[in-house]
Amino acid sequence: MQTKSGKNNAKTMFGIDNIPVDNHVRNILDKIDPKSFKKIYEDILEECQKLKIINQFVFMKKYILVALDGTHYHSSKKVKCSCCQSKTDSRTGIINYFHSAITPTIVHPKVKNVIALFQEFISNKDGQKKQDCEVNASKRWLDNFNFFNQKYKLIILGDDLYSRVPMISKIKEKGHSFILVCKETSHKILYEQIERFKSANSHKTVTIEKMHNGKKQFFTYNFINGLLLTGGNIDNAEVNWCELIITNLEGKKLHTFSFVTDLKITLNNVEEIVEGGRTRWKIENENNNTLKTKGYNLEHNFGHGKQYLSQNLCSLNILAFLFHTIQELYDTLYMELRSNLGARKNLFEAMNILTSMFTFINFDKMIEFILISRESDEQVPLKDFILLN
């Protein structure tokens, strides 16, 4: 656009005077410590608090639910560095080198959107004998995240990998609570206790009738407080256990969900606690899956670099997703546009086409133009929205 008309959308929309070539950007990003982006994420969170966006995510009146999960964002069979993790194919012997990160996300059972937080990269260090892992990276993230300490208490959500004594101890050490998936196959001692309680009919239970897709289902909640996670006397954790069994009218079991938590479970709150635990799936569906398949292409190899390029490209990608989320939660014009266009990909494609053809007066004018063009049967006058030569 700059070459054709002497104007460009980077200048009119975002105030960028000089646009560097992509290789120059990569060279700059490669040298920047990834932790430098943390302050940007925190500034956005601070604005979310001022705008009361965070209020939508308050759970059980005083908590914020944060789901933890790991995801890959770069892989190659040739390009590698000292920070790469690796996995050897047992059949072919071929080594795959990859980068991954913990992508913490604020979630809420009643809110469609999620708020992405600053990542913790799973990264091998020089001299390290064992590869870094998801749990260790999650512990580091807990050590470094203290944004809500004064106002809200966090409830950490995680899959069965997290419901172990070391992780629970770290969560409690940082002053947080937890609702973690707890599978029978990996918690033998805990479930032996549960079976004893069930056999003696000493557990609490409540069944609620609900409608799902026009069909009646029964949600049965079972819970027991004050169990030991493992059999050890020293390295142990006291937990409260709950499960949800969903059955249909014929009594067929459709789904079972089970969790451990440090929150005291009662007949009045068991449904809400289980609902909070189940919200963990939003980190996979609304966060990681969106980043990979809905237009952000997180797993695409945008570049590896010699130092920090791949980490920083990952962080910037998630930052873009965060900005779009905040717009969707607060900006009425953007909300209307998303509702009108549906999938994010549709919006990205429309923007890509329009910005390659026209220089808009500003970002809002582009949004208005897309909306009016879709809603009006008459031709929209371009002069009201773009800069003319």
Could you say what each language-model-derived stretch is?
Residues 1, 21, 25, 62-73, ...:
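Short, conserved catalytic/metal-binding motifs centered on acidic residues
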Residues 1-42, 171:
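Short, positively charged, Gly/Tyr-enriched micro-motifs
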Residues 2-4, 206, 212-219, 292-389:
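A short, flexible helix-boundary coil/loop motif
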Residues 26-111:
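Active-site-proximal, Lys/Arg-enriched surface segment
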Residues 88-153:
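Electropositive, glycine- and tryptophan-enriched low-complexity nucleic-acid-binding patches
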Residues 128-189:
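Domain-level cores of phosphate- or acyl-group-handling catalytic modules
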Residues 183-280:
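An anionic, glycine-rich sequence signature occurring as long contiguous blocks
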Residues 267-302:
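Short amphipathic alpha-helical "interface-anchor" segments enriched in bulky aromatics
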